[in-house]
């Protein structure tokens, strides 16, 4: 099998340190399945992981993947060889930048039948992230009627997470306010289903007042938590809930949350697979719901760019594009 990896952490300005490696196909054990990978999607987390300590070289990155089950471990009950599946993997295992990958069945689901592999692979990591935010953290109802009248502000609505989060929120009955700044990102947010799109290059509090937008029940921050921290506190309702996927880089005053009794949560979709939590199967269930909603026409894929061929050059270029922080939707590599 072929893998694209690296020996040591590196920044892009050091040059392209991705290399091709070959090894024998692994044999699945326990609840693992062996997947022949067809397509992968590259995420911002890949660029962060590339710069972290390498404990076992070569380090093979990659999270989103779609492919065909080739073999199963003795404890596998959900899949059979030949099934086409998609998943987001785990950072404590070798990733999907490879022609074959081992992954636990608990974080895998059968892929949608009505869209292409390059489209479907845009959904697992961002979709699970959004599902965990809405259903585990915000605890919205699975009955859309029970969520009517509630609203969410999604900061950076045109990114990979924001794109699918908007669709999920609309599917389950929330009013969705997102942010963007360019014409093309604003139009993308509207295409994803946003009710209101605000300009995040301008004062959001002022825009809320000018447009007479009520304070929101939930805020989902997918970009620069430090920059928006105080703004989010102003725009959330009393007893509201803020969730971010972006770590703080500066010290922030947690006491500022007290006056409104705001709940603040970090979302990290890899927490379940890294720690093999007892409820890890939820990621399988969330992916199943994504497949159901894609096949019923409620969701659309978020792929906007496709590279042909798994190579060090394509992977390096993908990381370059993501580090510019101007991507709309998702970038895919067709293996």
Swiss-Prot record:
InterPro entries: ADH-like_C (IPR013149), ADH-like_N (IPR013154), ADH_Zn_typ-1 (IPR014182), GroES-like_sf (IPR011032), NAD(P)-bd_dom_sf (IPR036291), PKS_ER (IPR020843), Quin_OxRdtase/zeta-crystal_CS (IPR002364), YIM1/Zinc_Alcohol_DH_Fams (IPR050700). The keyword Zinc applies. SMART domains: PKS_ER. Keywords: Metal-binding, Oxidoreductase, Zinc. It holds the Pfam family ADH_zinc_N. GO terms for molecular function: oxidoreductase activity; zinc ion binding. SUPFAM superfamilies: GroES-like, NAD(P)-binding Rossmann-fold domains. Belongs to the zinc-containing alcohol dehydrogenase family. Quinone oxidoreductase subfamily. PANTHER family: ALCOHOL DEHYDROGENASE RELATED (PTHR11695), RETICULON-4-INTERACTING PROTEIN 1, MITOCHONDRIAL (PTHR11695:SF294). This is Zinc-type alcohol dehydrogenase-like protein SAS2087. It comes from Staphylococcus aureus (strain MSSA476).
